Each structure stands twice: as C-alpha cells, then as structure tokens.
Amino acid sequence: MLCAIYRSPKRDQTYLYIEKKDDFSRVPAELLASFGKPQFAMLLALNERKTLATADVEKVKNALIEQGFYLQVPPPPESLLKMHLGETKA
C-alpha cells in the first residue's frame, strides 16, 4: 500500500497521509483549510514498514482504507510544571 505524505505549512510537525498523490477528494474541506496548502514530503510504501516515527502503521493503513486520509499531529508538549514537581519529589 503506497501513500503520499504532505506537511502542513501552518502547523509544525503536522502531516497528512493520503492514498494517492495530489488526490485530496476524500479529505474534508475544513481540514484542508486549517491544514494550509499541503507541501509534498514523500511517497511511502506502508506494506514494507513495521513502524513509523510517530504513527502506528496499522492505524494509518486503517484510516486510509476507511476515510481516505490520516492526520498525524505532534504529541502534546510536556508540562514543565509536572517535570519540575517530579524532579523535586525524587
């Protein structure tokens, strides 16, 4: 299964995976508007991969089949307060 990956010019570390390069027909218009003009990053063969950097391969495959796209967002930033409190308790 091949997919095309695009990065968002508006949101750092946000990527959109779609089934076919330049075919955004299954991506909601609202998502595309908030994502910005997609910037092509790469084509990726998902069948040849067991892992991805920050996304679960099976979740990506299922999302592509069921809804035609997968949106990868960055993990939430760690709370500096929680980190500080954790260090002071140790």
Swiss-Prot record:
Cysteines engaged in disulfide bonds, as pairs: none
Domain YcgL per the UniProt entry, residue ranges: 1-85
Matches recorded under SUPFAM superfamilies: YcgL-like
Matching Pfam families: YcgL
Superkingdom assignment: Bacteria
Protein name per its UniProtKB record: YcgL domain-containing protein YPO2080/y2231/YP_1923
